[in-house]
Amino acid sequence: MALFRKKDKYIRITPNNSLKGSVSHNVPEVPDELFAKCPACKHMIYKKDLGLAKICPTCSYNFRISAQERLTLTVDEGSFQELFTSIETKDPLRFPGYQEKLQKAKEITGLHEAVLTGKAMVKGQQIALAIMDSHFIMASMGTVVGEKITRLFELAIEENLPVVIFTASGGARMQEGIMSLMQMAKVSAAVKRHSNAGLFYLTILTDPTTGGVTASFAMEGDIILAEPQSLVGFAGRRVIETTVRENLPDNFQKAEFLQDHGFVDAIVKRTELRDKIAHLVSFHGGGQ
């Protein structure tokens, strides 16, 4: 029996569907591409505030940029001549899903492979230039990446040019097995021939530079620069900690840590790299 049920002390409101629809219709939608979250300070940033260099205005974190964006920041306008575009990536091991991954990377980046190679001018100084793009299968080094960089050094020897490489990589490309690992030795041999010719080689380490690229040509430059807070190393942090059974410093494998221990010559802000490259190339004989 519900003869003595207490009355509710609140009223019930039935939503007015027509009113609800009109309210939601007037709420402005913010496009996803307008803002970016800084991985370092976690702040939401209006993308236009990042500028062309894509540097966080709050903490100065350097966002990862594409090879084309790097090219725009670095070389004299209209001076870049791309080379070795006809070299095609093969699938010698018939690795499952590799062809699809390659095609997707090409569509995302507009590149044929993980490295952009060519000749360019930087403030009037001619250089042989390679820029690795981490958006292309994490800039992993396969046979084509190794071949393009090797040919770049060979061209630089023939034309008496300095070589400048912006490195970024997750390491050797597992889909190509031992052939990807062989690129470490092949490129290093080309670096040696270039050095024997008395020519200048400059590397700029960007985030991330790891694995086989670090263990070969990334650390073989006559001068090694790095962008602030770039991750640079061979094996991963957790792998090392598990192996040595020790806790590593918080800044371990950061560019600043490597500079303190003599592996990097200087940390250079992204906005100052163009001037620094031109100065170093000119100081070491130039490229005219």
Curated annotation (Swiss-Prot):
Residues 34-288 form the CoA carboxyltransferase N-terminal domain. The keyword Cytoplasm applies. Disulfide bonds: none annotated. GO terms for molecular function: acetyl-CoA carboxylase activity; ATP binding; carboxyl- or carbamoyltransferase activity; zinc ion binding. One of its GO terms (biological process) is malonyl-CoA biosynthetic process. Pathway: Lipid metabolism; malonyl-CoA biosynthesis; malonyl-CoA from acetyl-CoA: step 1/1. Zn(2+) binds at C38, C41, C56, C59. Its cofactor is Zn(2+). InterPro entries: AcCoA_carboxyl_beta, Acetyl_CoA_COase_Trfase_b_su, ClpP/crotonase-like_dom_sf, COA_CT_N. GO terms for cellular component: acetyl-CoA carboxylase complex. It is found in: Cytoplasm. Keywords: ATP-binding, Cytoplasm, Fatty acid biosynthesis, Fatty acid metabolism, Lipid biosynthesis, Lipid metabolism, Metal-binding, Nucleotide-binding, Transferase, Zinc, Zinc-finger. The keyword Nuclease does not apply. Component of the acetyl coenzyme A carboxylase (ACC) complex. Biotin carboxylase (BC) catalyzes the carboxylation of biotin on its carrier protein (BCCP) and then the CO(2) group is transferred by the transcarboxylase to acetyl-CoA to form malonyl-CoA. Acetyl-CoA carboxylase is a heterohexamer composed of biotin carboxyl carrier protein (AccB), biotin carboxylase (AccC) and two subunits each of ACCase subunit alpha (AccA) and ACCase subunit beta (AccD). Belongs to the AccD/PCCB family. This is Acetyl-coenzyme A carboxylase carboxyl transferase subunit beta. The lineage of its organism: Bacteria, Bacillati, Bacillota, Bacilli, Lactobacillales.
